[in-house]
């Protein structure tokens, strides 16, 4: 993408942290959706496939959350620290138009 367009649209601030958080949120949604689908499966074969996909989604979630914790971007066991990080990210997002 053109650097000028990236700046004007705010796409120049797409960081690894933002991408990782988006993937983590998507992984959480995948886990939830596979779990719900498995409980509604019409046949044992379909349920088995959905459970296998659920396990893969759980593995992906674990890998993403571990990566983010190693980087200091995610603090699931320390709510106070996570709130501080979230507030810092909010302040950064608010300041983006002025950067």
Curated annotation (Swiss-Prot):
GO biological process: sporulation resulting in formation of a cellular spore
One Pfam match: Coat_F
Keyword NAD appears in the UniProt entry: no
Disulfide bonds: none
InterPro entries the record matches: Ferritin-like, Spore_coat_CotF-like
Swiss-Prot/TrEMBL keywords: Sporulation
Domain of life from the UniProt record: Bacteria
Stored PANTHER family: SPORE COAT PROTEIN F-LIKE PROTEIN YHCQ
Family from the record: Belongs to the CotF family.
Name of this chain's protein: Spore coat protein F-like protein YraD
Source species of the chain: Bacillus subtilis (strain 168)
């Amino acid at each position: 993408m053109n650097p000028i367009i990236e700046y004007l649209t705010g796409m120049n601030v797409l960081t690894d942290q933002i991408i990782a958080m988006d993937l983590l949120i998507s992984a959480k949604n995948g886990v939830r959706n596979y779990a719900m689908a498995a409980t509604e499966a019409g046949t044992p074969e379909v349920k088995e496939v959905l459970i296998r996909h659920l396990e893969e989604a759980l593995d992906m979630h674990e890998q993403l959350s571990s990566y983010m914790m190693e980087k200091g971007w995610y603090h699931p066991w320390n709510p106070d620290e996570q709130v501080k990080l979230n507030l810092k990210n909010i302040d950064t997002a608010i300041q983006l138009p002025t950067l």
